[in-house]
């Protein structure tokens, strides 16, 4: 009986930490934060029914063949930082003019970065990532994890691994303003 108790105790000690470990992204806190980031994007006029339409440009995977970038400083939960919203458009033979004339028809997803407080993820310049569907719901990866937070941190592919390669070291490809 004592050996059986020791085996059960050892098994519990090894497995309980696995279940209590936080997911690297897409956890409840990330989902709550993603909703706040989406609301800030609406309030900024970047997404939603009355969204600003800027001049789209030709893009590339994984975001889309036509992209639109909008950004400004916003405050979320007392943290002020850059909000970078990328609208990702797709469609067969899509052109910039197609998107200008009917952006809602071609919008496939919206990817957002928000620079969080110092220490949120210092190794990755404190960026929060979210990938949203056009209706504001979070997109999911093939494993069903919601794409919000430190998306794919430590993975060979995904938001963070790609953005580490951005020139200037600020995790933004279009410019180097957020060093």
Q: How should each PLM-predicted stretch be described?
A:
Residues 24-29, 76, 80-179:
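Sequence context surrounding c-type heme c attachment/ligation sites in exported
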Residues 7, 70-73, 128:
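A residue-level detector for conformationally permissive "hinge/kink" positions
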Residues 23-93:
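N-terminal secretory signal peptides
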Residues 1-11:
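Bacterial N-terminal signal peptides that target proteins for export
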């Amino acid at each position: 009986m004592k050996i059986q108790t020791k085996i059960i105790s050892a098994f519990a000690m090894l497995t309980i930490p696995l279940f209590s470990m936080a997911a690297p992204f897409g956890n409840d806190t990330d989902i709550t934060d993603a909703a706040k980031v989406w609301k800030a994007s609406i309030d900024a006029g970047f997404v939603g029914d009355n969204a600003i339409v800027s001049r789209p440009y030709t893009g590339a995977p994984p975001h889309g063949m036509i992209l639109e970038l909008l950004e400004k400083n916003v405050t979320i939960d007392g943290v002020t930082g850059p909000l970078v919203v990328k609208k990702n458009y797709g469609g067969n033979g899509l052109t910039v003019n197609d998107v200008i004339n009917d952006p809602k028809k071609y919008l496939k997803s919206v990817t957002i970065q928000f620079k969080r407080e110092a220490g949120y993820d210092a190794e990755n310049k404190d960026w929060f990532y979210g990938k949203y569907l056009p209706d504001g719901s979070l997109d999911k990866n093939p494993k069903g994890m919601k794409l919000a937070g430190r998306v794919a941190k430590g993975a060979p592919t995904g938001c963070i691994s790609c953005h580490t390669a951005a020139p200037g070291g600020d995790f933004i490809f279009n410019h180097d303003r957020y060093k």
